[in-house]
A protein has these predicted regions:
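Enzymes that bind and transform nitrogen-containing heteroaromatic metabolites
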Residues: 2-169
Length: 169
């Protein structure tokens, strides 16, 4: 059930292993060049909403995107142009001028966002990994798969992976 009203296509974007791992020690575990290109192509020019730890995992803010960072820390210092809020609801409100804002992590933010997003852009990495951050199971009663593209591993991609788009039923 959706719990927040918004007029845009609020999209969650995530890469998930076969055993639902999304990260370890606040970092990505795998490097899939085409998945990173897809992330850039989809999110470029849009608001990206993330938790503080996800933001701090970047060497610097990502170009051509409006960063909205959720943190409980009072007086959190961020680079100029980065918007700081204290809740997912406040982040969505700050992104309301964007027709397609993205939720980009991390684990706690994803759990909250599943209740409010319209679309999930999901990369399934066809391999199991050890990790400490997991993505919840996607319920088929709430989400409908609308697109799937399989990519075989190759010289640039150590693992098979699939792009899957889910839309809220």
């Amino acid at each position: 059930m959706k719990t927040t009203n918004h007029s845009s296509n609020l999209t969650l974007i995530v890469a998930v292993s076969e055993n639902d791992v999304i990260g370890k020690d606040n970092d990505l575990i795998w490097h899939l060049k085409n998945d990173l290109k897809r992330f850039k192509a989809l999110t470029s020019g849009h608001c990206i909403i993330m938790g503080r730890k996800t933001f701090e995992s970047f060497p610097k803010p990502l170009p051509n995107r409006t960063h909205i960072v959720i943190t409980r820390q009072q007086n959190y210092k961020a680079p100029e142009g980065v918007i700081i809020v204290n809740s997912l609801e406040a982040a969505i409100k700050k992104a309301e001028q964007d027709t397609n804002p993205f939720i980009i992590g991390g684990g706690e933010i994803y759990k909250q966002a599943l209740n409010v997003v319209d679309i999930i852009e999901f990369t399934r990495v066809h391999h199991s990994f050890e990790g400490d951050t997991f993505f919840p199971v996607i319920s088929e009663t709430i989400w409908k798969e609308t697109d799937r593209i399989f990519h075989k591993k190759d010289d640039l991609h150590k693992f098979d992976f699939s792009y899957i788009t889910y839309k809220r039923r």
